Amino acid sequence: MLRRLVLIALALISVFAIACSGGGDIEPADSYDSLAAALESAGMNIDELSENKFLFSGLFSVPGVELTASGQMILACEFATLEEADEQAALVSPDGYGIGLKYINWSNDPQYFQNGKMIVIYDGSRSLVSETLFTAMGERFAGEAPGGA
């Protein structure tokens, strides 16, 4: 009887741990929807995507979207072609503070990621967001990880 109770308890704990882990497989992100799905797979709550009409809307040749992942703002731009995305990425300075002739005074060290026709900017310090973007988008092409790592 005790053995049965222990097995049931272990099964319940396992199911609970899997359900709460939020550690689903993170697929590569190459669109707004797949970016949101990747962040959700990591256990983050995603607010509605909205067109970026704020101060940073003129950074690239497309306005892009703002999305909030568990309170962290992420800017994403999806370009019409890979060539356009590559041209726009080439405008970003290695430290991420300059884009072409524009200088942005970010509140944290910005991190830039590119996967195909999509460029994502994260100006925050939450490691879960940075790690998820790294997994979904690939290595940073500009900027630094939080803490300069």
Task: List the predicted regions and their residue ranges.
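Soluble non-cytosolic domains of exported or imported proteins
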Residues: I26-D33, S127-E131
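Hydrophobic helical h-region of N-terminal Sec-dependent signal peptides
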Residues: L10-S14
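Short, solvent-exposed recognition patches
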Residues: D33-N105
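A short, solvent-exposed beta-edge/loop patch
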Residues: G100-A149
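Bacterial signal peptide processing site
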Residues: S21-G24
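Bacterial N-terminal signal peptides that target proteins for export
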Residues: M1-V6
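C-terminal motif of bacterial Sec signal peptides marking the signal peptidase cleavage site
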Residues: F16-A19
